[in-house]
Amino acid sequence: MRLSELKNAGRTPALPINLALADAAGPAELQLLTLLRVLPGQRYVGAGVWRGRPVLAKLLVGQKAPRHFQRELEGVRLLAAQGMTTPLLLADGLEQNEGGWLLFEFLEQSQSLGEAWAEVEHQTPLNDAQQAVLGEALSAIAQLHTKGLWQEDLHLDNLLRSHGKLYLIDGAGIRVEEAGKPLSRQKVLENLGVFFAQLPKSLEPFTEELLVHYLLSNGEHGLPMEALQKQIDKVRSWRLKDYLDKTGRDCSLFSVVEGASGLRAIRRDEEAAMLPVLAQADELLDQGHLYKTGGAASVGRVEVNGRSLVIKRYNIKDVAHWFKRFWRPSRAWHSWREGNRLLFLGIATPKPLALLEQRFIGLRGKAYLVTEYLPGPDIIERFAPYVASGDAPESELVALDELFQQMIRERISHGDLKGHNVFWHQDRWALIDLDAMCQHSSQSSFATAFARDRARFMRNWPADSALHQLLEQRLPKV
């Protein structure tokens, strides 16, 4: 295959791919065996073999290939020139009307810090394991900054452990202020803002403690916490908006198809599993365990290839109901978006897997939402033995405190906080049924909505019960 043919290969070209390339030593064939990242028509990154040696290949095609190639090459050279630990560039080339390629040494038995973080992310905030991962990352970032460089697309997956070393990867994101001289304070604050904004908000009280790892390797500037927090908040807000935008467009995270006859959105890594589920959603619901049927919605647990899922069908009851619904986004879309919002914010909820809106010449009709199934129990069942005594397990009460604190931090109101919508799952309380959920832009509107949520939640138990009185005393208010 010629490199230029990759431009039309789509997201999942058949592997292996044999590409004829040439470097200073002459022509040779690259055999691409796996794909790690794909931006269709522009970028293909994967593992392969070149001149008998395993390599990581970055293949750049399309109109933007020359610019992307130069940016990648410049970044790699900057890292090497400043003595940073980065994979060795073995071969590179740019051919007019074909594209560009960069072949790097393949790091065997490697693990990104992103993968390492995923293993410890849900542990107690800033325990030793978390501190080790984040401290290692901050030390590497500090060393980069001492050389006048920064990683524009800074995240933990761009730091790779292999054989006792930590490698900086992705030269395309490397920027330089003045090579060899420490980065200015403003650039440091901006770049650290990008890093800390990606961490769970539960770690926010530990920012200053974590910063010590950075300052031990780069003490060039005093870093005011207020200025750093301002950068963190700015980036965090942008990242949430960007992520929510992606839930409605075709990208590496989501497969989205929209037209006059409907809208379909699926998590990219669930596409193969969810397409047949959406195609037979009604039949699966009919055969499943129904929690709610008829009226505005039907909800049921279904089994697909040994996997439990929940399907919620948003019905159109009659013509009058259709006239109220066809012109605005469906409740399925709202729940899809809000479920993804909660996951992004680190608030437990069943993962939304797929969405389908049926449309007739663009006018909305029935809609479907598929999510993971949480076995429960809900909080009514879980706390039933403790209503009279109030002796609910402290760990579960602390988890409930944390859920309410998260809602306050993010200005989230649920809209129907009855006990059957709060589930115990993996040592956390998870929210389900997000049809009325809202993230408020103003504190005043949030305070009113949260007060309603809290009052509805407390009505789950008799006001004179010990459990009610305990929760009334300890659950946070605004």
Regions found by a protein language model. Give the residues of each.
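Juxta-kinase regulatory segment immediately upstream of eukaryotic protein kinase catalytic domains
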Residues: 1-33, 228-288
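Conserved ATP-binding subdomain of kinase catalytic cores across diverse folds
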Residues: 20-117, 124, 136-147, 272-380, ...
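Short glycine/proline- and charge-enriched loop/turn segments
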Residues: 58, 118-124, 170, 189-192, ...
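Short, glycine/acidic-enriched loop or turn micro-motifs at the edges of active sites
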Residues: 108, 156, 173, 375, ...
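Catalytic-loop of the protein kinase fold
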Residues: 149-156, 412-419
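Conserved protein kinase catalytic/activation segment
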Residues: 158-170, 421-432
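C-lobe/activation-segment region of protein kinase-like
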Residues: 167-239, 429-478
